Amino acid sequence: MNIKLINIGFGNIVSASRIVAIVSPESAPIKRIIQEARERGMLIDATYGRRTRAVIVTDSDHIILSAVQPETVAHRLNSKDANKEVEASAEIE
């Protein structure tokens, strides 16, 4: 079984197969989605107190906040070596 994992910053990792969208948090509709997820208890804040730069929407309706730029997360998602890096770090631990 080969599960691709994506580093979303500060050692936080998300399964690539669960990601539906990676968007910027600037627009009003995304801010509403974040607030609704917070009220439902479906918000995961992975920013470590830093500014939110990317909002990741998952297929389970969880909303994940990341301090990494959306372009960076997308690049890691599309990178073939990203999974190898995560596997290597998992073997070391």
UniProtKB/Swiss-Prot annotation:
Naturally occurring in which organism (per UniProt): Alkaliphilus metalliredigens (strain QYMF)
**Signal sequence: where?**
none
Identify this protein by name.
Putative regulatory protein Amet_2791
Give the record's family classification.
Belongs to the RemA family.
The family database entries (HAMAP family) matched by this protein are listed as:
RemA (MF_01503)
Task: Spell out the NCBIfam families in the cross-references.
Answer: MtxBflmRegRemA, PRK04323.1
Coiled-coil positions are none
Q: Which InterPro entries does the entry mention?
A: RemA-like
